[in-house]
């Protein structure tokens, strides 16, 4: 497992970044959804500890949303929600 200092929120990652999910840490994401609901949705999409991720594409305006390859699936995700996914 990566040290805490080595972890970066997926929401800050740039195109072609690759890493492994270390944990989901939902804090204040400025969302209308509760932290529990955001965490549940991320897990349902496959964002679980140990999963390999790669940022494939960034949106044109504000680099949002991002397209992320998670295992064998491609998922579009807002950077705001991706901030809860810590990768290393």
Model features per residue range: what roles?
Residues 1-48, 54-60, 64-88:
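Compact, charge-rich alpha-helical regulatory domains located at protein termini
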């Amino acid at each position: 497992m990566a040290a805490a200092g080595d972890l970066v929120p997926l929401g800050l990652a740039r195109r072609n970044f690759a890493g492994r999910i270390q944990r989901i840490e939902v804090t204040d994401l400025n969302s209308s959804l509760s932290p529990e609901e955001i965490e549940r949705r991320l897990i349902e999409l496959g964002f679980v500890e140990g999963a390999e991720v790669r940022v494939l594409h960034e949106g044109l305006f504000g680099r949002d949303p991002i397209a992320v390859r998670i295992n064998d699936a491609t998922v579009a995700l807002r950077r705001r929600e991706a901030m809860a996914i810590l990768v290393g």
